[in-house]
Amino acid sequence: LETIGSTGSPLVHESFDYVYNHIKKDVHLASLSGGTDIVGCFVGGNPISPVYRGEIQGSILGMDVDVFNDDGQSLVNEQGELVCKKSFPTMPIKFWKDDGTKYHKAYFDKFNNVWNHGDYILKTINNGFIIYGRSDATLNPGGVRIGTAEIYRQVEQIDEVVESLVIG
């Protein structure tokens, strides 16, 4: 076993620990994130860079991924919106039966013609990424952004809770 891939939701610290403590200490754990709308990934693993607990290794070849605050400024070590600053090979060109209005509003309105994917993310000092979930599923009480993953992590520590659903 050389590589384990993970996708579908953010890979939490506990999952990294489980893989390295119970499956194999020297396996390459490659988490990735993208979308069905792009038929691909924005960020993911590669076989030559180090793997850091809780981080996705970096952006995928051909993707100019960045993290923007609400003013469109690049962030490092702060949470913000996942954006792709240049066109990419799998970028959809339009929506079916749309004159371009819905397509532009879905991806390009927020940051003036920069693709905004709608994921809440952090770029680390290692040039890795941590995904916190969908930005439209992020709660913002008193100006403090809380992703649903953080709420689930706390709620699921309660033995009496079998299943939960966070609604903002």
What are the language-model segments listed below?
Residues 6-7, 32, 41-45, 68, ...:
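Generic beta-strand/beta-sheet core signal
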Residues 49-55, 105-107:
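Short, P/G- and charge-enriched loop/turn segments at secondary-structure junctions
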Residues 88, 102-105, 113, 118-168:
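AMP-binding/adenylate-forming catalytic core of the ANL superfamily
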Residues 56-62, 115:
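Short coil-to-beta-strand transition motifs
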Residues 59-60, 73-111, 146:
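Conserved ATP/PPi-binding loop(s) of AMP-dependent carboxylate-activating enzymes
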